[in-house]
C-alpha cells in the first residue's frame, strides 16, 4: 500500500477521475482531520473502498509523548516499518487566558520535525548521531508529523503554525523529500503553511544550500554553526572537513532570501568550548556583510555527554558583544528541560528501555 500523503495535489489529481476528487480528499485530511477513507461522505462509496484498499494515510503512530510544565510536548512516533522518530510541539508566548489567568489557548505554535531516521552527520554533541543513520523519511512522513500533532492537540486549521526542520536528521541530505513536503504544506487545500513560516536548518552542506536556493521555495535558512574556526568545528562536526566555514559563508551569501528576513545562525554554546569573547569577536568578522541573526542556544546536557551547560554570565556577555557590534542576537529560551526535549533523547530512552526489558 502507498502513503497518500506522499502525493501532491496535482499528482493525486492525475490518479483520480474526475480530478476534483483530489481536492475533496485533501480537504477531508488536512482541513477536517479525517484519516478514514470510508468517512469521506462526499466521495462515491466505490471510490472510498478502492482508496482504502490501495492507500493508507500518514502511517505514524504515537509511541510516547512527554509534556513539559512549559507546555512543550515531545512525541516519539513509530513508523510503518517500526522505526522511530521525534517531533516537538512548542507553544509560543502569546497565550489567551481567562479571567483567572488560566491559559485557554496559544495564538501560535512551532512544530519541530524530523527529516530522517537517525543522522549521518555525526555531531559530537548530538545524541541522534549515536544511533547512526537508518533511512530518509518520505515527504508524507514529514507532512504527517505536522498534521498528526495538529490533530492530537486540536489546533484549528486557521491557527498560525511555524515549522522548523530541526529534528532528527540533516534535511539537505534528504532534499528531494523535504522540498516535496514543503510544497505539499504550502498548498491552500493542504495545511496552507506559508514558506516564510518554514525554516530549514542545516549543518552547512554548501552544495545542497545552493540547490535549495535554486529551487526557489521561499523558505527560511538556518545554519548550525556552533564554532567559529575550522579546527574546532571539525572536532564538533566532522562534516566540516567536506564543507568548511568559508564555503558555508559563500553559500549563504548567494542564497536568495526575502529582503525582510535574515539567515539564522544557530550557535550551541558549551562551557569552556566556544563561549569566549574571542569566539564572539571571530563570529562578528565571519558574519560581516551577511544579513544574519544569531540564536545562542544553551547546551542541554544528556547522559554520556562530555560537554556542559555554559554560565548565564558568559551567555549574556557573548550576546552583548554581538549586539554592540550590530548583529541581531537572541538567547533561545530553553523549553522542555524537564522532559527529553533535546534531539534524540526520547528515542534513545525508548531504545534503552526496550533493551533492558529484552
From Swiss-Prot:
It comes from the Bacteria. The active site is at 86 (proton acceptor), 343 (s-methylcysteine intermediate). CDD domains: Radical_SAM. It is found in: Cytoplasm. Its EC number is 2.1.1.192. Its main location: cytoplasm. GO terms for cellular component: cytoplasm. Keywords: 4Fe-4S, Cytoplasm, Disulfide bond, Iron, Iron-sulfur, Metal-binding, Methyltransferase, rRNA processing, S-adenosyl-L-methionine, Transferase, tRNA processing. InterPro entries: Aldolase_TIM, Methyltransferase_A, RlmN_N, RNA_MTrfase_RlmN, rRNA_lsu_MTrfase_RlmN/Cfr, rSAM. One of its GO terms (biological process) is tRNA methylation. Residues 105-338 form the Radical SAM core domain. [4Fe-4S] cluster binds at residues 119, 123, 126. It catalyses: adenosine(2503) in 23S rRNA + 2 reduced [2Fe-2S]-[ferredoxin] + 2 S-adenosyl-L-methionine = 2-methyladenosine(2503) in 23S rRNA + 5'-deoxyadenosine + L-methionine + 2 oxidized [2Fe-2S]-[ferredoxin] + S-adenosyl-L-homocysteine; adenosine(37) in tRNA + 2 reduced [2Fe-2S]-[ferredoxin] + 2 S-adenosyl-L-methionine = 2-methyladenosine(37) in tRNA + 5'-deoxyadenosine + L-methionine + 2 oxidized [2Fe-2S]-[ferredoxin] + S-adenosyl-L-homocysteine. Binds 1 [4Fe-4S] cluster. The cluster is coordinated with 3 cysteines and an exchangeable S-adenosyl-L-methionine. One of its GO terms (molecular function) is tRNA (adenine(37)-C2)-methyltransferase activity. S-adenosyl-L-methionine binds at residues 169-170, 201, 224-226, 300. Its cofactor is [4Fe-4S] cluster. It holds the Pfam family Radical_SAM. It is an enzyme of class 2 (transferase). Specifically methylates position 2 of adenine 2503 in 23S rRNA and position 2 of adenine 37 in tRNAs. m2A2503 modification seems to play a crucial role in the proofreading step occurring at the peptidyl transferase center and thus would serve to optimize ribosomal fidelity. Reaction proceeds by a ping-pong mechanism involving intermediate methylation of a conserved cysteine residue. This is Dual-specificity RNA methyltransferase RlmN. The gene is rlmN.
